[in-house]
């Protein structure tokens, strides 16, 4: 026997140990007392030595280990296995102990919680649940009163809890786990098994086998894949699910276990008659002779509970009390059968209410029990009954039998189970299908959850449709996406929901009416709305995305509602409506003939008038990825948002067969459990992003057709920029930068360097490419960074940090090494710009108008034409002398103004007059003072500058030998003369090309002071006092003119003039006196090199003047 689990095992085992000890002591004491009495029966030592435990019993306690107490309800008696679930217990038995599966497996008692094997369960039912046949049947009045009191009004004490298994998809219940599982195979997995099912003789449309097929047809089906031939349709479905589809866990998940209250079994009112009595049943003889009168039957509750023993494996042991039951044709409408049945065979006799009962036959035959003389059968229940009737089986009181139902005595055996099939206008195939004669061993029973009645399976559907017909209520939930029969996904919450909690979750968001789009959070209110407003509306066809719920509302009386919720349909989206197809249909008046209406409803889905595209349904929807609220046409807005914002389109996963998304760049399919972060991660490495945007105009792409200015660009944009990049851009833009940061996102990104071919390089190689890109473009835009990241397979943050670090390093280098820009300021342009730079007095520049420059031009002529190629170094040396004097750079290029040649009266050698434009200021000084000073100096200048042809030739020779002189001259400041070559080369380079400036701190700061202006006249007066022709040469040449523009201290110019008289090379002293010592040692050699060609040319000039 099966023992139920026990709680508080600790305390029980302590007491059990004590009890066992006491019992063992008592037994030992009893043995000691009676050992002398049994000595005469004791065998000799030979038998004791040659006897083992196997001779005494089959179980040897020394060979086994004491097993722990198993608390789980389903324990295997052959091994230590135990389980909480019957499915696991049964699978264990099938796999481990399959040799005696049918006889040893535990079965559930349909009336109580007792479990045992088959044989023990039959004995249990016979002893404890067999109806008592000692009920009085003396008179019909007593029988009626008892029926009234006991049957129609059951007492509370008559109810008992019954453990049953139930199907979670519908209201099917059965005490046996196997029956419920077969029901699920047959009812809910036809679509799974349909592709595998094939018939031997013919091919069905979808492979499904009707429920009403007989045993011969069921034996003809087989599996297409492995040619497995099962015994029944359920066996084939089970084979497909477990062997091919491997989704047996879904079947297990659909089976639940609960306790229901059922009426306790009462004594059977049918009394077995004496053998000589042929009319039986204890009723008066006059009842059997009624032709067209009123027939009173037993109460349905009593009859079903006495005659229905839902054990398909009970043959004769459990129902011996029914062996001698005789049924008469006129009482119950059982039609005659045209053949005899032997002993042990059974026949299904149709009772009132379409509840056939399997009754094993004994020696009597059916012909003997059902004589053909009574040629009238009564089809009970032929009248239409009100829907509020609580009982269906055997309710035939005061029912007149129409004469059209009189049948001939010779009818086929297949009609025996269809006595009451005419009660419904259109019975389903389960009620009309002829069952096989030997089908009693697999008869399935179901308990009606509303009236707690137990019916055979083929009767249950008819009973439920007739007595408890559910009210169909359509609803729409576009935010629910049906994954499969057990799981759905809420697109609002982006979470997966099981079937048991799905309805409650949908009521939180609300269910919409498919006709008027009203939203309800209560099923009862929605049903009332459908009854009041849309009572004549026709429902659309049921699709694969429809979820069905069978509900019972407690509103005084039971109200059954069959809720049909249409969810997001992937096949119809977005072209067709993903909501209900009939949401915008015009009301179709109901037709009187339901068959014609069904044929008219077939083309509803394909007709363009009925199926309104869902994109025309304007409203609000929610993006399942970023939960943004979208307005406008729902399908268009969602598809457009997914393409533009997330760069995906909806599709079906080719393997998972679930809704997922596909990248619009590389057409890669995401998995069904992806999120928005998955898309972001993919776009970083997606190679199709760069290919799609590399120089192509995407205005003609489909994604650009309906783009509005408010929508984001194709690339997923981020509102914030990387912080180091953003700060640097702001700092640079606050300074005067002509470039603008704003850019049009529609324009294609043009990169400074093409990253193609570098995506497969190493990490260091890609970083070196970024360094090269930094040298070209140190300030990339956000879209450039995104494109570089996509092309080089790098993170955008890595690229931004790389550029930021490079910029910081440049700034640090400028601060540490104090570099100077070799080209001087263009002061004329610089004075036009508002700046905060402060210049010292020695770097003060004066601004001369064009009139003064023309006057000065008359005094000087260009020397380049006469000096030839050697004068290039001369001008270069002057250019770099200006840079030395400035000592710092500027982001402006120098512009040198060369005055045109002016012929003079005397034959003179043209002397260059170079006026640097950078030396001109916007502010004008006192021009009168300048004019007076120039007039005073004109006479002496024109007189002393006359040069002959011979000095000119000497100047050419001196220019040609300037390099040789540089090597011979000993420099006083210790500078290496060998640096003159590179210096001159550098001069030419800077003359031809513009300088690349580095952003950094300027090494020297200057200010414009009045002291510099006051020192200029003194310097000029000192220069005019000098009578030396060399000094006059300085004043009239371009280098002497520098004195007028570059205002030096007076002492410096005095030292320069004295050195010119004393030393053979006065230009060296002049150069040393003008070198800026603040420029740093790193620029000394460069300055010396720059000055070499200048001194060579100056030497030539001085020689010519001295020889003259």
From Swiss-Prot:
GO terms for biological process: cGMP-mediated signaling; estrous cycle; intracellular nitric oxide homeostasis; negative regulation of gene expression; negative regulation of neuron apoptotic process; negative regulation of synaptic transmission; neuron apoptotic process; neuron differentiation. SUPFAM superfamilies: Homeodomain-like. Its main location: nucleus. There is a cross-link at residues 39, 72, 144, 155, 203, 231, 266, 274, 278-279, 311, 335, 367, 407, 426, 599, 605, 615, 620, 631, 657, 698, 715, 727, 730, 744, 806, 828, 834, 913, 928, 941, 1022, 1041, 1048 (Glycyl lysine isopeptide (Lys-Gly) (interchain with G-Cter in SUMO2)). It is found in: Nucleus; Chromosome. Residues 1-685 are annotated as: Binds to beta-catenin/CTNNB1. Residues 354-361 are annotated as: Neuroprotective peptide. Residues 393-422, 691-709, 977-988 have a biased composition (Polar residues). The modification N6-acetyllysine is found at residues 1041, 1048. A zinc finger (C2H2-type) spans 74-97, 107-129, 165-188, 221-244, 446-468, 488-509, 511-534, 621-646, 661-685. Residues 928-938 have a biased composition (Acidic residues). GO terms for molecular function: beta-catenin binding; beta-tubulin binding; chromatin binding; copper ion binding; DNA-binding transcription factor activity, RNA polymerase II-specific; peptide binding; RNA polymerase II transcription regulatory region sequence-specific DNA binding; zinc ion binding. Residues 753-813 bind DNA. The modification Phosphoserine is found at residues 98, 408, 412, 607, 708, 737, 804, 875, 877, 885, 888, 904, 959, 961, 1077. Induction: By the neuroprotective peptide VIP. When isolated from the sequence, the neuroprotective peptide provides neuroprotection at subfemtomolar concentrations against toxicity associated with tetrodoxin (electrical blockade), the amyloid-beta peptide (the Alzheimer disease neurotoxin), N-methyl-aspartate (excitotoxicity), and the human immunideficiency virus (HIV) envelope protein. Interacts (via N-terminal region) with beta-catenin/CTNNB1 (via the central armadillo domains); interaction is direct and stabilizes CTNNB1 by modulating its phosphorylation by glycogen synthase kinase-3 beta GSK3B. PANTHER family: ACTIVITY-DEPENDENT NEUROPROTECTOR HOMEOBOX PROTEIN, NEUROPROTECTIVE PEPTIDE-CONTAINING PROTEIN. This is Activity-dependent neuroprotector homeobox protein.
């Amino acid at each position: 026997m099966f023992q139920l689990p026990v709680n508080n095992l600790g305390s029980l085992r302590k007491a059990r140990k004590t009890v066992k000890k006491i019992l063992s002591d008592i037994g030992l004491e009893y043995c000691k007392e009676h050992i002398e009495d049994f000595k005469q029966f004791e065998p000799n030592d030979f038998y004791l030595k040659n006897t083992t435990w196997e001779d005494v019993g089959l179980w040897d306690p020394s060979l086994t280990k004491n097993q722990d107490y198993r608390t789980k309800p389903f324990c295997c008696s052959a091994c230590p296995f135990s389980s909480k679930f019957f499915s696991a217990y049964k699978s264990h038995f099938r796999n481990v102990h399959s040799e005696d599966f049918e006889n040893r497996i535990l079965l559930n008692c349909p009336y109580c919680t007792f479990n045992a094997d088959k044989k023990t369960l039959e004995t249990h039912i016979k002893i404890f649940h067999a109806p008592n046949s000692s009920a009085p049947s003396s008179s019909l009045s007593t029988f009626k009163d008892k029926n009234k009191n006991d049957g129609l009004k059951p007492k509370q004490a008559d109810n008992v809890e019954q453990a049953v298994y139930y199907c979670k998809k519908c209201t099917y219940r059965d005490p046996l786990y196997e029956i419920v599982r077969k029901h699920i195979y047959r009812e809910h997995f036809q679509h799974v098994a349909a592709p595998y099912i094939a018939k031997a003789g013919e091919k069905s449309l979808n492979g499904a086998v009707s429920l009403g097929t007989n045993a011969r047809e069921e034996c003809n089906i087989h599996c297409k894949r492995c040619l497995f031939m099962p015994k029944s349709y359920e066996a084939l479905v089970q084979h497909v699910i477990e062997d091919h589809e491997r989704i047996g866990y879904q079947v297990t998940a659909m089976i639940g276990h609960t306790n229901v209250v059922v009426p306790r079994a009462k004594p059977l009112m049918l009394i077995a008659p004496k053998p000589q009595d042929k009319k039986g049943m204890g009723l008066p003889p006059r009842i059997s002779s009624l032709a067209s009168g009123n027939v009173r039957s037993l109460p349905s509750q009593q009859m079903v509970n006495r005659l229905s023993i839902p054990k398909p494996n009970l043959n004769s042991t459990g129902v011996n009390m029914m062996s001698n039951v005789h049924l008469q044709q006129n009482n119950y409408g059982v039609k005659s059968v045209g053949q005899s049945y032997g002993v042990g065979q059974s026949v299904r006799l149709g009772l009132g209410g379409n509840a056939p009962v399997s009754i094993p036959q004994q020696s009597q035959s059916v012909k003997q029990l059902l004589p053909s003389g009574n040629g009238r059968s009564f089809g009970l229940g032929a009248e239409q009954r009100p829907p509020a009737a609580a009982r269906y089986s055997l309710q035939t009181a005061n029912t007149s039998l129409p004469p059209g139902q009189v049948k001939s005595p010779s009818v086929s055996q297949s009609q025996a189970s269809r006595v009451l099939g005419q009660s419904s206008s259109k019975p389903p195939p389960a009620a009309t299908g002829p069952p096989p004669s030997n089908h009693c061993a697999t008869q399935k029973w179901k308990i009606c959850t509303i009236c707690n009645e137990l019916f055979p399976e083929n009767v249950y559907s008819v009973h439920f449709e007739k007595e408890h017909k559910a009210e169909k209520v359509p609803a729409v939930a576009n935010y629910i996406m049906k994954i499969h029969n057990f799981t759905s996904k809420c697109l609002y919450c982006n979470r997966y929901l099981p079937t048991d909690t799905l309805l409650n979750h949908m009521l939180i968001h609300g269910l919409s009416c498919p006709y008027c789009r009203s939203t309800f959070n209560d099923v009862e209110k929605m049903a009332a709305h459908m009854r009041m407003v849309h009572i004549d509306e026709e429902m659309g066809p049921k699709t694969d995305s429809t979820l069905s719920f069978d509900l019972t509302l407690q509103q005084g009386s039971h109200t059954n509602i069959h809720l049909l919720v249409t969810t997001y349909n992937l096949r119809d989206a977005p072209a067709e409506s993903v909501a209900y197809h009939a949401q915008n249909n015009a009301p179709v008046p109901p037709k009187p003939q339901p068959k014609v209406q069904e044929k008219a409803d077939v083309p509803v889905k394909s007709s363009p008038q009925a199926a309104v595209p869902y994109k025309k349904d304007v409203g609000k929807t929610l993006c399942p990825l970023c939960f943004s609220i979208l307005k406008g046409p729902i399908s268009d807005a969602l598809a457009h948002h997914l393409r533009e914002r997330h760069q995906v389109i909806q599709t079906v996963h080719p393997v998972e067969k679930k809704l997922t998304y596909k990248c619009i760049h590389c057409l890669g399919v995401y998995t069904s459990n992806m999120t928005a972060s998955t898309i972001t991660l993919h776009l970083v490495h997606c190679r199709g992003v760069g290919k799609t945007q590399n120089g192509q105009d995407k205005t003609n792409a489909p994604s650009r057709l309906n783009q509005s200015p408010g929508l984001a660009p194709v690339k997923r944009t981020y509102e914030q920029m990387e912080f180091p990049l953003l700060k640097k851009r702001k700092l640079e833009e606050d300074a005067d930068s002509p470039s603008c940061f704003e850019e049009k996102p529609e324009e294609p990104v043009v990169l400074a360097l093409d990253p193609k071919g570098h995506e497969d390089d190493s990490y260091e190689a890609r970083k070196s490419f970024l360094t090269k890109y930094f040298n070209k473009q140190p300030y990339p835009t956000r879209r450039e960074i995104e494109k570089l990241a996509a092309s080089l397979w790098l993170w955008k943050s890595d690229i931004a940090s790389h550029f930021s670090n490079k910029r910081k390093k440049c700034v640090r280098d400028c601060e540490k090494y104090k570099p100077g820009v070799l080209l001087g300021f263009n002061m004329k342009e610089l004075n036009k710009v508002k700046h905060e730079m402060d210049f010292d007095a020695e770097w003060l520049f004066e601004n001369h108008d064009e009139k003064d420059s023309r006057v000065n031009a008359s005094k000087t002529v260009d020397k380049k034409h006469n000096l030839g190629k050697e004068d290039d170094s001369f001008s270069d040396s002057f250019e770099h002398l200006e840079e030395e004097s400035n000592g710092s750079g500027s982001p402006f290029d120098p512009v040198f103004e060369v005055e045109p040649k002016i012929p003079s009266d005397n034959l003179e050698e043209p002397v260059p007059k170079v006026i640097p434009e950078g030396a001109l200021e916007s502010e004008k000084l006192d021009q009168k003072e300048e004019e007076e000073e120039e007039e005073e100096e004109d006479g002496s200048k024109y007189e002393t500058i006359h040069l002959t042809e011979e000095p000119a030739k000497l100047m050419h020779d001196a220019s040609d030998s300037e390099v040789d002189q540089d090597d011979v001259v000993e420099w006083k400041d210790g500078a290496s003369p060998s640096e003159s070559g590179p210096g001159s080369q550098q001069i030419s380079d800077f003359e031809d090309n513009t300088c690349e400036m580095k952003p950094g701190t300027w090494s020297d700061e200057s200010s414009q002071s009045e002291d510099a202006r006051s020192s200029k006249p003194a310097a000029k007066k000192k220069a005019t006092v000098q009578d030396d022709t060399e000094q006059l040469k300085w004043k009239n040449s371009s280098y002497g003119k520098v004195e007028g523009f570059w205002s030096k201290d007076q002492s410096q110019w005095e030292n320069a003039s004295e050195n010119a008289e004393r030393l053979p090379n006065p230009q060296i002293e002049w150069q040393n006196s003008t070198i800026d010592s603040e420029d740093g040692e790193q620029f000394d050699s460069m300055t010396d090199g720059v000055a070499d060609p200048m001194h060579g040319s100056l030497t030539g000039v001085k020689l010519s003047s001295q020889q003259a």
